[in-house]
Amino acid sequence: MSCMNYASRLSKNEYKGPLGEEEFFEDTEEEKKKVKELIEKIRSSEYIVVHSGAGISTSSGLQDFRGPTGIWTNEHLNELKNKKKRNHDFKDNKRKLKSNDINCKNTSDMCSPSFFHKEKKENTLNIVKRERYYNEDNVDMNACNERVVHPNHVYVNHEDDNNNNNNNNNNDNNLYNNVYNSVGSNDHTNKESILIKKENNSENVRKDIHDKVNTKNVKKIDVKETNNLDPENYVIFGKRKKKVIELHLALPSKTHIMINELINKNIIKFMITQNIDSLHHRCGKHFSKTAEIHGNIFTERCDFCGRRYLRDYLISTISFKPTGSLCFLCSFPPIGVCTDVLLDWNNSYEEFFHLNSIKHSQIADFHFCLGSSFYIVPASSYPSKKKYANANSYSCVINYQKSFLSKEVNLNIHSNVNNISDIIIKEFSLNPLSIRSARITIVRCPINTLDVICDKLISIHNIKMKHKSMRQHSIDYSQMGNKDEKYNNEKYVKRNMTECLYYNKEGECYEKRKYKLMEKKFFPNNQQNEFIPNRINIFEQKFHEHNNNNNNNNNNNNNNNNNNNNNNNNNNNNNNNNNNSSSSIDSSCSINSNYHISKNINPDFSFVENQSNIYENYKEQTFILICPMIINIKTVRLESFHKVYIKLLDDIKGLWFIKTNFSCILEVELWYHSFILLKLDFNKSDPFIQLNAWNVNVAYTYGDDIDDFDYFKNDENIKKPFNLYKNKYISNMRREGHVNNLYTLDNEKVKSNTSNNNNNNNNNNNNNNNNNNNNNNNNNNNNNNNNNNNNNNNNNDNNNNNISDHNIYDDHNNNNNKNHNNYDKDNSNESYYCSEILNEHVHVGYNPNNYEPNCKVYILAYLDNLRTRNINNNVNNNNFSRFNLTQSCKLLYNIYCVLNKDNEQKKNSTIKETYDKLDYFIKNFDFNRDSCLYTNNFINMLIQNERHGNQSRYKFRERRKRLLNDYSSCSSDDDQSGKNIFIFYNLYMNQYKKKEDNEINDIYKKYDVHEKNIYDESKQYVHKVRVRTDLINHKSVYKILKNNYLVNINNMKLMEKKNNSEKLFLINDKDNNSLLSINNKENFNCIPSRQNNVKKNSEYMHEEENNKTNSNENIARLNNNDFIQVMETEKQKKYNSFDKYNSDRSSINDTFDEIKYNKNNDNNNDDNNYDDNKNDDDNNNDDNNNNDDNNNNDDNNNNDDNNNGYIYSPVLFINKKFKLGELVYKIPKYVKPQKIYTPYKKISRNKKYSNTLQKDRYEKWKMLYEELINNENKTYIIDSVLYKEISYLPYWILNYVNDLFECM
């Protein structure tokens, strides 16, 4: 978007100052004298304040406002041109009407009375027609009156004018041209004698452009070309011209670099700018030394805390309206609504910047004014000695045109600002280099945790389903996003097959898919008599035109061969899953997996993988990537069972959703023709949310005026030393001669061979799953190998059969290289890296001076879990500083990990109970259309859905009392009519549509939910969640039994046995000698060790791992008043789903003195934790005035104590090269914005929490966390709001880190 788009947002204002004034140019000798005086004044001044305008950005390709090709100047010229054209067309049409009414009379009509009543004066056209009538078109044009040639007008010959009109498509013909064209073809006049006046000639504005143009780095401009310049596409500054570029692609000029370097050297104390292009901040962030009095088109401001964020994308609103973003630093969960900071004509200056500008203007002894005419008030008042400037101060103005302050300034220089800035840079030995970098933030999380990622993905409207209707009807989920269609359980969907086209960001269709809903009957234990009710599954097929083979009827059903105790002997009886079409690489059908529903037809997320062993080995993971500078992403697959799905969720913010089941490489195209290779590391054994932030250079500039650089044209001749087929990973994996064959996915032979080998691949992977015990210590993707050397002999035979088939891709494979193709061979040892960008895989597109830095990319930050590894062993820890997250973020992080960890226990004796979260989520939920949460467009969607009707206008508090169905406030102007009403969160105000109490009571009875639990608070939506029991095995977690006896449950297998009355868990020891049933309600619980609600009558039992003892030998009877507690001290093993923690103590018969001593220490630590949590929650509070270093030191000292109450301890590590913004830790009190969109009275502040919402959510999350830990084997019904908050955590963390780096 150019500056013209910004100017069109402004309201109409007639007076904009003088437009298109004459420009002046200094002589060379006089300019040298003035520049020398300027440099001496800069050296001698003590307090310099810079006043900058739009003139310093014209060399960057941005238009000014009052220059020769300024925005307002072009508007004024266009208005005059249109006005003249309308007047000319009106007169011309009037003449034509009169000429058509003229009837040439015969001599017999001359006696009529009408002939004598004609006017004496006739038009010349009538005379010509009359002469042509009588003289038979032989008219002497020399009889016409001679034309008067005005000395001040510009005339051209007729032929030249016709040539110019044909070349320029400019049909502004004047009256003389119309007269000549009306003569006809029988014309014998001298055309050279006819002079035609040039209307709106550009030479009248700039007469010397074609004569005195500077030819350095500029194409030669012809006279005709200068006359044909489109002022909206080119900007003219001085004697130069440059093509207009977009605002987000503009690079800093030499003037911006000079100001930034002088601020770094403390020569310039303060800067007051009228520009909205943020080029000053692109050089470096100096919020406390900069006053943007007119706002910034890239900046958002939180309406709750006042923090400002510098975005890489343009803000679409003006006059402090909500943008759709939320502030993640002032509160977690986010509560602050972000607005723009652009001023309209009717808006006054922000008080913070206005007071700062007055303060520094009064102190300054030198006012350095650059590129502004100062016709806007009060911007012109700051350097004026008649207003705020000191009377004894010195002032200098550098501008081509005369300014409003020309009469009172001490030094006027009419010259190019960049030329003078270049001299200053050399005199003060400044660094002229400016680096434009892109920040790429990546989050990796398990696939089943993003059922509800954002409303652009999932929006469910008018879905009313009861208990059994969900599984009885075929529903086309791909059409649920359409708001105009309503689905219920009484209607069948007529369209069973839906074709979806995939388009990239440039609008090119690159893939076609069709989706179908399938109904499968599931027969457990190979018994055809019993079957589970029908399950609706989304079935994905990729159809290719060259193959029309239909093998859908030959699909094999998935059979569970898992019996209670006899499945160990039936490992090889697993049936192969279906590969539905010979042309389909990724065809799949599922029974037990999760599926996703999208608002639009998003087939990338509407798929279910099959339950074959190959899929279990290659489970998928989700990567969320955000970077507004990304243009396109490309990738390839190494094997047929590798899957990569890429979807652009938000085009403005650059939010990408990537789902894959292997480590893949992405070729990412950025702005300025820059390219990178991004490697996404797949690690299925990692249940945590991991984050990496990278800083990549995309452009280098020295402020040179490089003209007409096309940022959008894709140059095919760009020479980058890497691509998807030739890079460091590929060269280490294969020879270059076979790389192209590996990635030729469009080859029909490869596809057909791949589809024919799918069954063999499934068989081999089944064999691998039966022997995973030998491969536990391998790398993540080494479990994907079909040819595993540790397999049994029977499996080796099967694998050898597949080697010959797999040689289609690679002919030079031998027995020593039997692994599948992957990128994990060069993985780094840093397990906290979920991605990788090498310096060799970065191509900087805009580098006119061929600058070669040592490092073009570096990791900016990463999120690590301290509980899983020792931080002292981190080699790169010295280059990073710790930034502790808030307690509410840590608490939600722990809940997320507990609930969403994949249960990878490979116990063949247990029945795999499938659970589809989204299935139950849809079945029990009835969404309102206004339930849009945490998305970029949620405000706009709510505004569009708002129905005003005949609703009277009244203020916020009256509206809150009278209407209870929403939580809203009026817009900025309550008195103006026609304003849209902004609806605030109805999420936290419990304003959802309520269900009937009978349905809720049935759910409570079914799932045994108590009234004290937090998840039945709202009593409208519930969600079923099963706690991952394997996550509770931690050193701060203990087993508790509320009976009078203790049982050793080590090395026992749990089997859930369904009964009519209650659920029982059968505990078998290792030798199957004893069997004990424990009630789920009373006996089996676990709680964290450090909690405030520890009761004295609690009975603790330590979980230990002893392979030699049985359960009957370790039974101890204790009284209610006895207290047993055992501390675990052995180091933690590598984390996975069934790791357990050993202990130094092999029995529970410890002395009571030591136990009481440990109890007292825990109670003391609890008190300390309360104070530390209080300090940590105040970290992001507005009243917190701590510095960066002090805060980090305190967090480092108190980190261990603060996190003892949680299982996991996430910490963000930030590279020391990057300095966080000033507003991250400290916000001046007078920066507070107006209280318009955030309900301050409802959400007040206190000392411990930033607002009451954070306190409320923290308390509810705390209660939920305690319930999950205390009852590990219990199935819970969680409120829909809490479930959405848990599902949104990866998206929240992504935005939290992004706001952390964009904060000014």
UniProtKB/Swiss-Prot annotation:
Domain of life of the organism encoding this protein: Eukaryota
Cofactor stoichiometry and binding remark: Binds 1 zinc ion per subunit.
PROSITE patterns, A to Z: SIRTUIN
Residues that coordinate or bind Zn(2+): C302, C305, C327, C330
Positions of the UniProt region annotated as Disordered: 545-585, 749-827, 1154-1203
GO molecular function, one term: metal ion binding
Catalytic activity: N(6)-acetyl-L-lysyl-[protein] + NAD(+) + H2O = 2''-O-acetyl-ADP-D-ribose + nicotinamide + L-lysyl-[protein]
Keyword set, alphabetical order: Metal-binding, NAD, Transferase, Zinc
Cofactor(s) in the UniProt record: Zn(2+)
Positions contributing to NAD(+) binding: 53-72, 274-277, 371-373, 399-401, 417
Keyword NAD appears in the UniProt entry: yes
Ranges annotated as biased composition (Low complexity): 548-585, 756-806, 1182-1203
Residues of the Deacetylase sirtuin-type domain: 28-466
Gene Ontology biological process terms from the UniProt entry: regulation of DNA-templated transcription
InterPro entries: DHS-like_NAD/FAD-binding_dom, Sirtuin, Ssirtuin_cat_dom
Enzyme Commission number, as recorded: 2.3.1.286
Active site: H294
Gene3D superfamilies: 2.20.28.200, TPP-binding domain
Pfam families hit by this protein: SIR2
Family assignment from sequence similarity: Belongs to the sirtuin family. Class IV subfamily.
Role summary: Regulates the expression of the surface antigen-coding var genes central to the malaria pathogenesis. Cooperates with Sir2A to mediate silencing and mutual exclusive expression of only 1 of the 60 subtelomeric var genes at a time, coding for functionally different but epitopically variant versions of the erythrocyte membrane protein 1 (PfEMP1) molecule, to evade the detection by host immune surveillance.
Name listed for the protein in its UniProt record: NAD-dependent protein deacetylase Sir2B
Gene name as annotated: Sir2B
